[in-house]
Every structure is written in structure tokens, then in C-alpha cells.
């Protein structure tokens, strides 16, 4: 498991405005919790805690 930005297909983050949206998204994917990080490296994006290794995360490189 790891703490990371959860990713959609093609290495893109989930953009967000509310912590509740990210917490729901993260926990549905097996994480312990999550929140919406504002003005972070990838803008306003969901960050998950203890996300399982089989769930895609944002890695260096472009979002296609």
C-alpha cells in the first residue's frame, strides 16, 4: 500500500473540490481515507492514504 494521488486511465488525476468526494473515491478503491489537495503539484486533486498497490496512481510524466 502507499499514499498517493489516485489516477484515472492515462495517468490523469481525479480533479476535486470537496474532501468528501475524494474520501469516498479513495475508500471505494480500498484506501483508508482521502482528501482533496488544493493547489498541489497537479492542481486540485484527490490524495489517498494507504491505497492498495493494484490501484493506479499518478506517476511522473504526462496525463494523456
Swiss-Prot record:
The keyword Transmembrane does not apply. GO terms for biological process: defense response. The keyword Disulfide bond applies. Keywords: Disulfide bond, Ion channel impairing toxin, Neurotoxin, Secreted, Toxin, Voltage-gated sodium channel impairing toxin. InterPro entries: LCN-type_CS_alpha_beta_dom, Scorpion_toxin-like, Scorpion_toxin-like_sf, Scorpion_toxinL, Scorpion_toxinL/defensin. Has the structural arrangement of an alpha-helix connected to antiparallel beta-sheets by disulfide bonds (CS-alpha/beta). This is Alpha-insect toxin Lqq3. It comes from Leiurus quinquestriatus quinquestriatus (Egyptian scorpion).
